[in-house]
């Protein structure tokens, strides 16, 4: 494409050195002159957008903030679509139309930062980050979430809560069938699922998210990565400070035998009777409902699901184990797709200072701890993983945090991600349905993605 930027790389240490040196003066200035304030004499009104929150913790967080900042700032929680793709479309329509009043603070997917920043839709908050979090900004957060907020050597968001794909399994049923540990490979998962479904009369062996949407993209990527395949050179492990951060990658690698093998393994779950045919239309709530009702042995899910086990279902937390995702062959590294949400400030917000005050509040240790305990939302602050009060109380916090640090892998880091995602969603789903072969799928995607971002 005509405005494509060449790929650039820098190590985390170089990123810190360049960022710290370039912002030395900015740090002294702090947030002065970095955004507008309230209009008139009343409180500044801040509109905050996010999807539905069944845990109730988000509305409680907003209510707490409003009580503590009464007369100064008032935050309105605007509920958006629960479907990530639809939420993204709603936001981009507002950005392009210059909607008024604008959404001031966006609770956004970790993958949106580069595209929003490249289009000038969100505020560069680098000065604010260094002023309020000290020159060692990345050390305050888990490496994967803070990396997701960076683009073009700047910070565009604050990590709010984080996610990574987990394998939930019926620990009680595996033990009853003679298995002492979770599967390490997909073949082991099939073997265990086949035996447990027969022994315990469970309907399905494995449920996951295979529908034609962003969740289906995430699941397809995990199958590809865990077979040794890749999509873009920017699909890197983001927890190693000595490995490069790819600012704008453009080398397409999906058209490989390893990528095809990953999609074949995904399809084989249906062909071998481990997963139901209906999984081609499953989203998070469908797979969660099946597992929570006792109808599945294994579930590929997110950390927040742990808090739901036992609520209006037959499975309680004591029956559930948590493991990393299986791989194609024993000894291969396991990767989980980095999920989670950042807080971005609209570049057209008339109340940037007030918006920043809310962002800092919502991402502060007290609020992250509250949402971790009440909703199993994984914190982004490293210090909270040493807080035994929440680690001991919510087991998924420690296990999920370890997986994020060791196994988290980002989706393609590129300003063209929305275009790439739509192609991946359609083709991954067609492969899962058996409408195209895995080989045809990856060859098709190789050509399409080269046209978009190559």
Where are these regions (language model features)?
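Glycine-centered hinge/linker elements that transmit conformational signals in sensory
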Residues: 192-195, 199, 234-279, 325
């Amino acid at each position: 494409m005509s405005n494509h930027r060449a790929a650039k790389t820098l190590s985390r240490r170089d990123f810190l050195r360049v960022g710290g040196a370039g912002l030395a003066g900015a740090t002294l200035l702090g947030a002065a002159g970095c955004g507008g304030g309230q209009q008139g004499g009343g409180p500044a009104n801040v509109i905050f957008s996010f999807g539905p929150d069944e845990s109730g913790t988000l509305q409680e967080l907003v209510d707490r903030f409003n009580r503590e900042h009464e007369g100064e700032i008032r935050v309105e929680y605007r509920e958006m679509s629960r479907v990530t793709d639809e939420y993204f479309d709603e936001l981009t329509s507002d950005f392009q139309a210059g909607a008024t009043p604008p959404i001031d603070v966006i609770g956004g997917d970790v993958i949106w930062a580069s595209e929003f920043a490249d289009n000038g839709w969100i505020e560069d908050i680098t000065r604010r980050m260094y002023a309020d979090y000290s020159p060692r900004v990345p050390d305050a957060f888990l490496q994967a979430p803070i990396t997701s907020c960076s683009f073009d050597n700047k910070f565009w968001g604050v990590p709010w809560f984080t996610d990574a794909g987990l394998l939930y399994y019926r620990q009680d049923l595996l033990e009853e069938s003679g298995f002492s540990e979770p599967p390490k490979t997909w073949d082991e998962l099939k073997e265990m699922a086949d035996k447990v479904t027969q022994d315990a009369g469970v309907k399905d062996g494995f449920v996951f998210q295979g529908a034609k949407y962003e969740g289906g993209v995430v699941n397809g990527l995990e199958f590809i990565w865990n077979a040794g395949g890749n999509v873009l050179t920017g699909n890197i492990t983001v927890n190693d400070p000595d490995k490069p951060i790819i600012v704008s990658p453009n080398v397409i690698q999906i058209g490989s035998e390893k990528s095809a093998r990953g999609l074949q393994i995904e399809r084989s779950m249906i062909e071998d009777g481990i997963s139901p045919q209906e999984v081609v239309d499953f989203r998070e709530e469908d797979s969660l409902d099946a597992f929570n009702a006792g109808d599945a042995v294994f579930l590929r899910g997110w950390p927040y699901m742990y808090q739901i086990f036992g609520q209006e279902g037959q499975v309680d937390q004591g029956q559930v184990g948590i493991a990393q995702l299986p791989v194609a062959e024993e000894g291969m590294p396991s990767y989980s797709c980095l999920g989670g949400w950042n807080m971005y400030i609209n570049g057209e917000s008339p109340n940037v200072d007030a918006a920043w005050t809310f962002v800092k509040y919502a991402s502060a240790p007290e609020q992250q701890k509250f949402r971790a305990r009440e909703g199993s939302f994984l914190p982004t602050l490293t210090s909270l993983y040493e807080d035994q009060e929440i680690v001991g109380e919510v087991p998924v916090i420690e296990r999920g945090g370890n997986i994020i640090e060791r196994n988290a892998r980002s989706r393609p880091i590129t300003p063209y991600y929305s275009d790439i995602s739509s192609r991946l969603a359609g083709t991954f789903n067609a492969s899962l349905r058996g409408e195209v072969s895995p080989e045809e799928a990856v060859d098709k995607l190789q050509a399409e993605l080269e046209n978009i971002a190559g």
